[in-house]
Amino acid sequence: RMLDYVFLCFFLGNDFLPHFPSLNIRTNGIHILLDAYKNIIGNKQDCFLLSKTYQTGIKIEWKQLYKLLLELSKNERNLWKQEYGLRSKWDKKPVMLHQKGTSKEKTELFQNTPVLYRKEEKYINPYQHCWEERYYQVLFSKNVCKENIISNYLEGIEWVSNYYFSGQVDWSWKYKFHYPPLLKDMIPKISTIKTTILPKRKTKPVPPLVQLAYVLPPIYHHLLPTTVDSTILDKQTGIPLHSNGLPNIEFQWAFCRYFWECHVKLPEIELY
């Protein structure tokens, strides 16, 4: 059961996958998951979300995951409404633009940006008809197919399981989006999965200095060792810059609580 508990927590978000707005760790997300697990799987003998054998290692039991997500999806819209209602309370609080405020007041205002400016969330509005379509319309690129989002997320569930439980992963894999698909939209796809879905591909982890080179703004590249290949640094040229040389970056904060949780929109950098 311990492995199942860890696996459940993947749906609350981690370093590799975003959390579901309807399953927020701040608003009883873990209890919602555990209640669904208790109702569907409980202590049934030989009934788990993950199985482990010497031959295959850790394996997702997709049939059981289907049942669990089906249970969660039945209440998905209500969970969205609850989360939306909690965040709507911030609309009643006046936004004081502390132009002459203290440094602490300005920092607090800045960090509260995601709950003070909720344009995208208000447009989605789960209380109104067709909110699901608006969710994908606002939070994903127009040319993205919903099926690709679903497949990519389900790959991610398997990838993260392999990463934490066996360490044998394709280091080139990534989840390509800032938000997950809706729970109900994953149900049809999961019902067709019988075995592993990730293609086997042998890759090496990205070297630490290369990782550092990719996250450092260009104006700080002089801090890197001279051994770092210049072609690596050249790949950052796609990031737009302000006139002062600092990166001109867009942020997306729908359903985030604090600004530091925002999703950063950056151009793709090919690693492999």
Task: State where each predicted segment sits.
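Long, low-complexity, charge-dense
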Residues: 1-272
